């Protein structure tokens, strides 16, 4: 069988094109099922691509990781049949066979690395020596699987290919240069590349930006999809496809080429002819340096960050945006809180999934008119990748340098027929995406600082801390906690400081309880808040003024207990009572913060 490493020393390697969009599967039937139900049809497709001039074919097993993760009965038989059909076809021409693995879901219950390893080992047992991990939006668990392959098959050739949008980011918000760099630095991946999502022209531009010493692969779609009478078709002529990729090969930029969605044997035949017509050129010297995210500089810090990073205790205060289009009263309230001594105004993003004025737009207006630092909350609930990126670029242009990345409260079940959740990200992936936008040659000249949520009242706080560590690893700088209203919350805050370290900035949540009804509601209906019984009982029979006084007293005590383990306080305004929060800030400065 063909030795891939030796071939790449002499000429480019040409893969086949798409199987899924070329093979005519019945509606609703997985293309991979045809390995068992229509082996002759699958074999015929392999033979067409080989006749077109392909040096290598992929097994018809793209969806196997997803099927394996779902414990779909018979996925092993699909792998075996797919392998045997590809080997049979390749044996007729001496072509190489690559075991093809598409993306695996990555969950706590079934990690992606575990799935990739299981599927790869299945192929290794069948005799596979070449492996293609393709159309990936993330590298989660990937290197674990590659390491397992190399341990079992030391001479295995592993090609890893990511699905990258024309702007350089995957659908999970990971930047192509960062992904390529990690593959390069792993020392166990043999080639890296891009496939799917983008058309030839866009992928050519992306490929020219990648650095590193590994062989580079490109397998674009034939073009961009269009829907014609409910059918998805890809526009893009084989001649154009071949010319664009041929230019990359001629420049020595890429060494491995092929096609993805919408490509046919005609595209591969045109590319074969283009490659064969190229003069022999020396391989282009690879650029070993990758663009990395710039470290934060003083120039990119606002007044809040300078104070926080200097070790001073800060005060952040949350004020919910209006439910209507009038911002007059809100700006007046924000100005009063600023005068009282707030360092930062935080603005929730449609809490409890009820529409309010956009938190990011309000943050920009407050920052522009008052000069007060703002922290808009950004949920994963309502925006896809494009909308999120557009909003982040606008925030940066307006001088807003911090954002709180959270998953967001789900939309109530009764409303889901009319209003849909998005949740393209988790808060951890959103943080990584925001951080990746900054750096040389990227969309932001400097980074945004990303904070996350830390639930001190979580029932299984060890799991909460593990997630907090993952958030830090994904680029978050610190956390705003849920309200501290119990001794256990203080203890968990102390544990957080010990576990997460001094570099993780923690703002302890303080929310004044103002009545017994308010306390009972918070305890029973607001996720993430725990109010101890003694607090609820203390409010019995109190009027509004008395309730506020007691709420202030309890908040001061909680702040005193929390501050030894926190970098500042995160105050939450109940019922938009700005006057109450002015008093709280004043007393905190007078009675608590003076000790620091």
Where are these predicted regions, by residue range?
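Domain-level signal for soluble alpha/beta catalytic cores
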Residues: 1-596
């Amino acid at each position: 069988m063909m030795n891939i490493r030796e071939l790449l020393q002499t000429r480019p390697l040409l893969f086949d094109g798409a199987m899924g969009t070329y093979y005519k599967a019945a509606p609703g039937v997985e293309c991979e099922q045809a390995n068992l139900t229509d082996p002759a049809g699958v074999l015929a497709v392999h033979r067409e691509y080989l006749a077109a001039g392909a040096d290598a074919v992929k097994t018809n097993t793209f969806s196997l990781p997803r099927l394996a993760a779902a414990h779909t009965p018979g996925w092993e038989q699909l792998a075996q049949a797919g392998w045997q059909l590809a080997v049979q076809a390749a044996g007729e021409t001496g072509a190489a066979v690559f075991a093809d693995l598409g993306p695996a879901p990555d969950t706590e219950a079934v990690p992606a690395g575990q799935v990739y390893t299981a599927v790869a080992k299945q192929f290794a047992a069948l005799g596979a020596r070449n492996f293609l991990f393709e159309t990936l939006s993330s590298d989660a668990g990937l290197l674990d699987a590659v390491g397992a392959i190399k341990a079992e098959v030391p001479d295995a050739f592993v090609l890893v290919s990511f699905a990258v949008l024309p702007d350089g980011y995957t659908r999970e918000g990971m930047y192509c240069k960062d992904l390529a760099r990690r593959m390069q630095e792993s020392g166990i991946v043999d080639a890296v590349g891009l496939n799917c999502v983008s058309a030839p022209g866009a992928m050519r531009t992306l490929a020219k930006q990648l650095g590193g010493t590994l062989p580079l692969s490109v397998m674009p779609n034939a073009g961009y999809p269009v829907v014609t009478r409910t059918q998805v078709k890809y526009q893009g002529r084989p001649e154009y496809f071949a010319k664009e990729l041929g230019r990359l090969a001629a420049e020595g930029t890429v060494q491995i080429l092929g096609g993805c969605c919408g490509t046919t044997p005609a595209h591969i035949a045109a590319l074969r002819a283009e490659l064969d017509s190229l003069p022999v050129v020396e391989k282009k010297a690879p650029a070993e340096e990758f663009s990395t995210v710039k470290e934060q500089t003083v120039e990119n810090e606002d007044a809040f960050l300078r104070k926080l990073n200097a070790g001073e205790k800060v005060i952040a205060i949350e004020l919910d945006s209006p439910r209507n289009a009038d911002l007059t009263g809100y700006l007046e309230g924000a100005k009063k809180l600023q005068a009282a001594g707030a360092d930062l105004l935080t603005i929730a993003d449609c809490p409890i999934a009820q529409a309010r004025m956009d938190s990011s737009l309000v943050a920009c207006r407050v920052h522009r008119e008052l000069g007060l630092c703002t922290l808009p909350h950004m949920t994963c609930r309502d925006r896809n990748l494009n909308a999120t990126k557009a909003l982040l670029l606008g925030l940066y242009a307006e001088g807003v340098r911090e954002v709180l990345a959270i998953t967001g409260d789900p939309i109530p079940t009764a409303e889901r027929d009319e209003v849909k959740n998005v949740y393209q990200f988790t808060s951890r992936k959103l943080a990584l995406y925001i951080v990746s936008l900054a750096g040389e040659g990227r969309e932001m000249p400097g980074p945004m600082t990303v904070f996350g949520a830390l639930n001190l009242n979580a029932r299984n706080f060890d799991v909460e801390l593990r997630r907090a560590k993952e958030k830090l690893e994904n680029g978050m700088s610190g956390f705003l906690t849920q309200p501290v209203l119990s001794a256990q919350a203080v203890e968990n805050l102390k544990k957080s400081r010990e576990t997460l370290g001094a570099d993780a900035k923690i703002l302890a949540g303080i929310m004044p309880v103002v009545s017994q009804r308010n306390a009972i509601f918070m305890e029973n209906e607001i996720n993430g808040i725990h109010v101890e019984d003694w607090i609820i009982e203390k409010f019995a029979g109190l009027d509004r003024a008395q309730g506020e006084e007691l709420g202030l007293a309890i908040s001061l005590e909680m702040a005193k207990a929390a501050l030894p383990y926190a970098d500042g306080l995160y105050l939450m305004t109940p019922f938009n009572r700005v006057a109450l929060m002015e008093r709280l800030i004043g007393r905190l400065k007078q009675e608590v913060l003076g000790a620091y």
